[in-house]
């Protein structure tokens, strides 16, 4: 395996991809309305019907499933549990797959640390299994997954676009793809008679963190080379291919670890009557288009019908160059704790999932069947085309995939970021079972995050509490500058020197940080503030919350800067931070369990 490099996103892309595996990160919840059930491969499963099906006897199977299908599988598991397999009662528990799952498998699963051990893993895509096998081979260890991993359901990658915009490009009659988006990114919507829509803006997740981002990145390389299969390392290194991919990447508004950020922000814009102003397109799975159009961007069946359908629906563009499927493989682990009895239940549950009634349930939630057949929801009326995709791409070999991720790290849109860290007195509180304070954990997480920035990025650092610089609640520790060796050393030194003192001057600092980045805005970069706090505003002479939000709205009308906030510790004002992030079309992250801060920082930096 490649060793970590001192380059942003060239930091062992396999390591990053393997650790997150396109799933949730243990201890972390992106605070945009998603359901938090405490589940996760390695998290505690929620109590439900299947946990009592065999009254504590028989064979219990734990399935770790990717987010988009976890709730559906949980319901199926509850219906399945109680069956007899090999003369024993079988019960199946479904948890949400997490990044910590693979890390725990790699080091040797510790139930005290990692929670219940999974017996089956069903990520969104087989690509993650290929990466895991590659990692095992590189470290000369046995792979915890075999080579036979049948699909339980499928959904192709599409380019989702507000319907009026897609129709302006010729949808549904005209074949469209990545090359069309590249051309559009070079001009604007004025070329298509809609100057009011402004520049073309693409939403795409980070390929190290998200299946849709990974498949979209692979798809752009195929489009760049004109190939439909057998992508090679040489193809990925081709200068013309790199130029094509870089052109697509530079139309990005920001990246991230989940498409839910884009879809939730788009829903809020639509609610406000500005659904054509946020993004022009976003790379998502086909199922997500239906979920969004039902007013349910989380895709959680329990929230379906609780929000109105959008005024401006999305439609799916199936890239004419070909696309990849998220195939939801079903991988029975080859670890020592998966004995013959569990294997028998795993095989029987797979048969159950692939049977007609369960396949209908998948297709009733806008998945395609395990063999790729569309159900009744895949219709043009729903913005989906059942005859598509006409061309299907196969994931490249793991070594080529590694090259794709490394190349993307060099070609992605650069970042222009200000990190703002709360150093109020409460940050000195000790975090149980760690031997460290909240500030010490946050400093280490921020230092670790620096390794993910590189020489194309610019990063600066502020600290804040109250009256840090005269009457100002904040103090610049390192100006925003190119992340060369000197700046990296400067940032690390300033972070390590932070000490806790004072109150929390949140509102004044937030607006000042936003304006600071606004004044150094780069049209060629993702401009953002990363704002971490463990408290609530305690400066009585500061702006009010309404004043802060009004100021952010005014500034947002100029050049776009996004404020990604982190609610750190139980006393953080999560509701306020959510409002700050929403008004800047970003996202708030929940780290109320301070031990999760390193993982949270990783997720936040995935936006750049």
Model feature map: region roles:
Residues 2-39, 55, 331-421, 432, ...:
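Extracellular/periplasmic juxtamembrane helices and adjacent flexible linkers that interface
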Residues 9-17, 27-138, 143-146:
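Early extracytoplasmic/lumenal segment of secretory-pathway proteins
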Residues 137-210, 222:
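A conserved helix-loop-strand patch within extracytoplasmic ligand-binding domains
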Residues 146-159, 242-256, 304-336:
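Periplasmic-binding protein-like
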Residues 222-316:
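Ligand-binding pocket segment of bilobal, Venus flytrap-like solute-binding proteins
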Residues 302-311, 535-583, 587-592, 596-604:
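VWA/integrin I-like adhesion module and closely mimicked acidic/polar interface patches used
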Residues 413-482, 509-510, 528-532, 565-568, ...:
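Von Willebrand factor
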Residues 430, 457-497, 516-520, 541-546, ...:
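Short beta-strand-loop
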């Amino acid at each position: 395996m490649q060793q970590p490099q001192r380059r942003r996103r060239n930091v062992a892309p396999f390591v990053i991809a393997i650790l997150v595996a396109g799933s949730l990160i243990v201890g972390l919840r992106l605070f945009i309305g998603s359901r938090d059930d405490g589940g996760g491969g390695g998290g505690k499963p929620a109590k439900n019907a299947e946990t009592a099906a065999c009254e504590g006897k028989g064979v219990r199977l734990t399935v770790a499933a990717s987010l988009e299908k976890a709730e559906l599988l949980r319901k199926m598991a509850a219906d399945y549990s109680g069956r007899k397999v090999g003369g024993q009662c079988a019960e199946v528990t479904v948890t949400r797959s997490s990044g910590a799952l693979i890390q725990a498998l790699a080091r040797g699963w510790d139930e005290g640390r990692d929670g219940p051990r999974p017996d089956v893993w069903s990520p969104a895509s087989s690509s993650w299994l290929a990466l895991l096998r590659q990692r095992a081979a590189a470290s000369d260890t046995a792979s915890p997954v075999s080579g036979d991993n049948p699909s339980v359901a499928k959904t192709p990658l599409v380019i989702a676009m507000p319907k009026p915009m897609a129709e302006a490009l010729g949808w549904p009659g005209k074949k469209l793809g990545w090359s069309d988006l590249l051309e559009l990114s070079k001009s604007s919507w004025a070329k298509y008679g809609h100057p009011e829509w402004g520049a073309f803006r693409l939403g795409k997740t980070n390929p190290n963190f998200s299946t849709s981002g990974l498949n979209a990145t692979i798809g752009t390389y195929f489009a760049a080379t004109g190939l439909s299969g057998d992508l090679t390392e040489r193809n990925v290194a081709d200068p013309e291919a790199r130029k094509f991919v870089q052109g697509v990447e530079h139309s990005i508004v920001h990246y991230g670890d989940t498409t839910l950020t884009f879809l939730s922000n788009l829903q809020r814009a639509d609610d406000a009557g500005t659904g054509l102003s946020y993004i022009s397109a976003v790379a998502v799975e086909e199922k997500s288009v239906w979920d969004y159009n039902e007013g349910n961007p989380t895709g959680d069946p329990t929230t379906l019908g609780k929000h109105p359908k959008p005024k401006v629906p999305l439609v799916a563009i199936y890239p004419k160059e070909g696309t990849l499927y998220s195939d939801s493989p079903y991988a029975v682990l080859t670890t020592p704790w998966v004995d013959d009895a569990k294997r028998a239940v795993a095989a029987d549950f797979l048969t159950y999932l692939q049977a007609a009634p369960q396949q209908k349930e998948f297709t009733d939630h806008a998945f395609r069947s395990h063999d790729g057949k569309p159900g009744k929801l895949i219709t043009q009326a729903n913005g989906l085309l059942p005859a598509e995709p006409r061309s299907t791409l196969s994931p490249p070999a793991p070594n080529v995939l590694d090259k794709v991720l490394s190349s993307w790290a060099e070609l992605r849109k650069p970042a222009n970021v200000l990190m703002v860290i709360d150093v109020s007195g409460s940050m000195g509180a000790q975090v149980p079972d760690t031997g460290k304070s909240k500030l010490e954990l946050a400093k280490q997480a921020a230092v670790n995050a620096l390794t993910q920035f590189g020489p194309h990025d610019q990063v600066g650092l502020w600290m804040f509490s109250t009256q840090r610089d005269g009457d100002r609640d904040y103090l610049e520790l390192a100006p925003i500058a190119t992340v060369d060796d000197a700046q990296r050393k400067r940032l690390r030194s300033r972070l390590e020197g932070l000490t806790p003192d004072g109150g929390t001057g949140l509102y004044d600092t937030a607006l000042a940080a936003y304006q600071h980045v606004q004044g150094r805005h780069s049209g060629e970069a993702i401009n953002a503030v990363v704002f971490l706090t463990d408290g609530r505003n305690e400066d009585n002479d500061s702006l009010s919350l309404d004043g802060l939000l009004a100021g952010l709205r005014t500034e947002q009308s100029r050049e776009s800067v996004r404020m990604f906030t982190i609610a750190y510790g139980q006393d953080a004002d999560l509701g306020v931070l959510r409002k700050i992030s929403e008004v800047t079309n970003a996202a708030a992250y929940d780290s109320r369990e301070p031990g999760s801060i390193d993982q949270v920082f990783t997720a936040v930096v995935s936006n750049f």
